[in-house]
């Protein structure tokens, strides 16, 4: 389970890496369950999507070859502040939300569409991208846990697949929250070394940069195709110096 990750810094990286404005308020360097972090989603709008009309073909132009339809406009992304640890929409109270969200910082891609905690959020296509510089795992090969930082080899920010939710209580309280989607890493050349032996190895579903918009807009059945283990040779592991 990924319960600790490092936020993007400096904040000037947000526009180039994710095509969103930098956060208005500082984000903690290290994120843990129930701490406020940020995520990126498709901009929410109550307006109907514009209908793109096909380009007319003049009578003088040859009509032997069909013209390609105009490309659909890319979704506008927005950066949102939320709690790390998802609060399901059916939670009854703030106190219950606090208890449950601590355990809901990760969602397994294999069961996300059937889990009582995440099913509604997944089917509503409330997908997001969680920006980070690195995530942390324990190296237990020596017999004691050694916190280890996992980052991209090139040092650039990572965009991890996630889900977001906005819970509203009976008294009007609201909590915006998010969770990280994870995939199996038993056979992963790097991540297979870490975490507890004899248990299933997991890792966050790091997205390819070119698939961000497609991930945010895909149909739920199609969205599963984006949830894959990130190549080991694109990642770098370093023990955390105390």
Model-derived segments and spans:
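Short linear sequence motif anchored by a di-proline
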Residues: 1-242
């Amino acid at each position: 389970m990924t319960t600790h990750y490092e936020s993007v810094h400096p904040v000037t990286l947000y526009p180039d890496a994710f095509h969103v404005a930098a956060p208005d308020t500082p984000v903690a360097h290290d994120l843990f369950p129930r701490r406020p972090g940020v995520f990126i989603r498709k901009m929410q709008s109550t307006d109907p999507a514009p209908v793109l009309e096909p380009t007319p073909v003049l009578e003088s132009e040859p009509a032997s070859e069909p013209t390609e339809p105009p490309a659909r406009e890319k979704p506008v992304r927005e950066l949102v502040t939320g709690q790390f640890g998802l609060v399901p929409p059916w939670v009854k109270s703030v106190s219950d939300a606090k208890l449950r969200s601590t355990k809901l910082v990760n969602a397994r891609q294999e069961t996300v569409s059937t889990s009582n905690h995440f099913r509604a959020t997944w089917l509503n296509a409330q997908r997001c991208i969680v920006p980070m510089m690195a995530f942390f795992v324990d190296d237990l090969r020596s017999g004691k846990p050694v916190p280890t930082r996992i980052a991209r080899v090139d040092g650039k920010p990572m965009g991890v697949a996630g889900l977001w939710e906005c819970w509203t209580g009976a008294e009007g309280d609201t909590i915006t929250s998010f969770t990280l989607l994870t995939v199996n890493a038993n056979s992963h050349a790097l991540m297979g070394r870490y975490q507890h032996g004899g248990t299933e190895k997991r890792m966050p579903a790091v997205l390819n940069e070119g698939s961000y918009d497609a991930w945010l807009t895909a149909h739920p059945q199609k969205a599963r195709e984006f949830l894959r283990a990130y190549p080991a040779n694109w990642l770098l592991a370093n023990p955390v110096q105390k």
